UniProtKB/Swiss-Prot annotation:
Main subcellular localisation: membrane
Assembly, per entry: Forms a heterooligomeric complex that consists of seven subunits: MrpA, MrpB, MrpC, MrpD, MrpE, MrpF and MrpG.
Record membrane topology: Multi-pass membrane protein
Protein name (database record): Na(+)/H(+) antiporter subunit E
Keyword set, alphabetical order: Antiport, Cell membrane, Hydrogen ion transport, Ion transport, Membrane, Sodium, Sodium transport, Transmembrane, Transmembrane helix, Transport
GO biological processes: proton transmembrane transport; sodium ion transport
Species this protein is from: Alkalihalophilus pseudofirmus (strain ATCC BAA-2126 / JCM 17055 / OF4) (Bacillus pseudofirmus)
Coiled coil recorded as keyword: no
General remark: Mrp-dependent antiport apparently occurs by a secondary, proton motive force-dependent mechanism, but the similarity of several Mrp proteins to membrane-embedded subunits of energy-coupled NADH dehydrogenase complexes raises the possibility that there is a capacity for electron transport that could provide a primary energy coupling option for Mrp functions.
Length: 158
C-alpha cells in the first residue's frame, strides 16, 4: 500500500511537471490521474488497489459515528424515562477477528459507544465480554456487532 501511495505521488509530480503549472489544483488533478492509472494497472501488476482500503476506513469511521449517534439516543431515552425499565447484562460475543490490532479496535469501538463497555477477552481470544446497559435480546446484540463493527474491521484489515 505504501508503494502505491508513493507511486501515485510520483505520478502527480510528473503530471505537474508536464503541465508546467505548479499549483495545488494541478497536483490534485495529477493525483486523481494517478489513482486512475493505478486502478487500471492493478490487474497487470497483481496488487490490491490501495483506495479500496481507504474507502473501507472511511466506511468504518462513518459507521462508528452512526452507531455513536444511535447509542446516544438510546441512552438519552433510558435516562429521561420515568421508569428504569432496563435489563443490564454481560454478553459473551464470539468474534472472527484474529490479530491483537483487530481485537483492540473492536473493543475500543464498543467501549466508545454509550451504553456498552468491553470488559475482557476469553483466554483464546474467541469471545469478547461486553457489558451493556440494556440487553433485551442477546442474540440480536451479537448479530448487530457482527454485522456492523466486526464486518467493517475485517474490510479494513483484509
Amino acid at each position: 500500500m505504501a508503494f502505491q501511495i508513493l507511486l501515485n505521488l510520483v505520478i502527480a509530480v510528473i503530471w505537474v511537471n508536464f503541465q508546467n503549472s505548479y499549483t495545488a489544483v494541478d497536483f490534485l488533478i495529477g493525483y486523481v490521474v494517478g489513482i486512475f492509472i493505478l486502478f487500471v494497472l492493478r490487474r497487470f501488476l497483481r496488487f490490491d488497489f490501495y483506495m479500496r482500503r481507504i474507502w473501507a476506513i472511511i466506511k468504518l469511521i462513518s459507521l462508528f459515528f452512526k452507531e455513536l449517534i444511535l447509542a446516544n439516543i438510546d441512552v438519552i431515552k433510558i435516562v429521561l424515562s420515568p421508569k428504569m425499565n432496563i435489563q443490564p447484562g454481560i454478553v459473551a460475543v464470539p468474534t472472527k477477528l484474529k490479530t491483537d490490532w483487530e481485537l483492540s479496535l473492536l473493543a475500543s469501538l464498543i467501549s466508545l459507544t454509550p451504553g456498552t463497555l468491553s470488559m475482557d477477552f476469553s483466554d483464546d481470544n474467541k469471545y469478547i465480554y461486553i457489558h451493556a446497559i440494556d440487553v433485551p435480546n442477546k442474540e440480536k446484540m451479537i448479530r448487530d456487532i457482527h454485522d456492523t463493527f466486526e464486518r467493517a474491521i475485517l474490510e479494513v484489515t483484509k
